[in-house]
């Protein structure tokens, strides 16, 4: 998912203590997919309650956020809105991949090949209206604010950083940098196997590559984005060489000849995305009893574990601090 920039940008390693007291805008869809993909049983089956409702995402939301809040990290979730029509091809491709993976997952289950089953199960994850709405419901009970983006959640999350409402964006996708996020944190997981936290400062990234943001966006378009296919044979390293030689425009012109849509529209999505500016951010006192009723009574969670997780939410108390106190 997203633009493949890993080969040309180097992260800084940071620790959770470096995020203490910080507000972090979290790409909700990206994070929910992560929960649904990784929080599964050995054979790839997602966690579910007695009625067959998936609960992997609820487990992830409760335990990851309670651990972050215990470390004095303040999450703000950002949910995607209506996708651009330019993203439809990517959406269709992902749907096809999920369907094919689900078929292979079931075949592996029939063969009792748990390793293969889990591999394909992770690729079959999808966000249903139930998963999205139940996630918002739990976040509200936990006192964690969320914002509805008009379009791409990554663009909205980047805007929160630009506007001073969050310190960094948390997402696995490098697209956040193209959307102008000043700071990006990857692998924001507690006790996961995703590896160490990775931190990217946009200004430092651009300085080290000796390019500007507009060039980074054009490089992304040549590599390929969620909104358009790239130019065949052009990866991150080749795109960077083209930028250094001043040949981006020539290659973009060639790509435009092959493309069915106006590439300038893709550039505009990254440079001037329509964002929601009418929002309020407030962390509230968690509703512990409601959380226990929702997770334990409705979805069969362990009351002891849920209660302990709720106790970690004590930093979100009724005496609300101002945003400035978190920076």
Curated annotation (Swiss-Prot):
It holds the Pfam family XPG_N. Its cofactor is Mg(2+). GO terms for biological process: DNA repair; DNA replication, removal of RNA primer. It comes from the Archaea. Binds 2 magnesium ions per subunit. They probably participate in the reaction catalyzed by the enzyme. May bind an additional third magnesium ion after substrate binding. GO terms for molecular function: 5'-3' exonuclease activity; 5'-flap endonuclease activity; DNA binding; magnesium ion binding. InterPro entries: 5-3_exonuclease_C_sf (IPR036279), Flap_endonuc (IPR023426), Flap_endonuc_arc (IPR019973), HhH2 (IPR008918), PIN-like_dom_sf (IPR029060), XPG-I_dom (IPR006086), XPG/Rad2 (IPR006084), XPG_CS (IPR019974). Mg(2+) 2 binds at residues 173, 175, 226. Mg(2+) 1 binds at residues 27, 80, 152, 154. Residues 116-246 are annotated as: I-domain. Belongs to the XPG/RAD2 endonuclease family. FEN1 subfamily. Interacts with PCNA. PCNA stimulates the nuclease activity without altering cleavage specificity. This is Flap endonuclease 1. It comes from Methanobrevibacter smithii (strain ATCC 35061 / DSM 861 / OCM 144 / PS). The gene is fen.
């Amino acid at each position: 998912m997203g633009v493949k920039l890993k080969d040309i940008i180097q992260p800084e390693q940071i620790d959770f203590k470096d995020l203490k007291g910080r507000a972090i805008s979290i790409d909700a869809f990206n994070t929910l997919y992560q929960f649904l993909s990784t929080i599964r049983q050995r054979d790839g089956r997602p966690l579910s309650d007695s009625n067959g409702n998936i609960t992997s995402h609820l487990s992830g939301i409760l335990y990851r956020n309670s651990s972050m809040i215990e470390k004095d990290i303040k999450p703000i979730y950002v949910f995607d809105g209506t996708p651009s029509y330019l993203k439809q091809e990517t959406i269709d491709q992902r749907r096809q991949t999920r369907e094919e993976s689900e078929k292979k997952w079931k075949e592996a289950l029939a063969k009792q090949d748990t390793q293969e089953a889990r591999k394909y199960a992770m690729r079959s994850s999808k966000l249903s209206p139930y998963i999205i709405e139940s996630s918002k419901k739990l976040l509200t009970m936990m006192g964690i604010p969320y914002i509805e983006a008009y379009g791409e959640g990554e663009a909205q999350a980047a805007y929160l950083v630009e506007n001073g409402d969050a310190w960094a964006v948390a997402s696995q996708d490098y697209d956040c940098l193209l959307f102008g996020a000043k700071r990006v944190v990857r692998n924001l997981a507690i006790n996961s196997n995703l590896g160490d936290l990775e931190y990217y400062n946009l200004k430092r990234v651009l300085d080290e590559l000796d390019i500007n943001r507009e060039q980074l966006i054009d490089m992304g378009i040549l590599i390929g984005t969620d909104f358009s296919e790239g130019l065949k044979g052009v990866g991150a390293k080749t795109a960077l060489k083209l930028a250094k030689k001043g040949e981006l425009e020539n290659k973009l012109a060639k790509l435009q000849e092959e493309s069915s849509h106006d590439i300038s529209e893709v550039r505009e999505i990254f440079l001037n995305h329509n964002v929601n500016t009418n929002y309020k951010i407030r962390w509230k006192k968690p509703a512990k009893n409601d959380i226990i009723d929702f997770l334990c009574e409705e979805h069969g969670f362990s009351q002891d574990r849920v209660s302990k997780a709720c106790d970690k939410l004590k930093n979100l108390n009724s005496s609300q601090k101002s945003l400035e106190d978190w920076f």
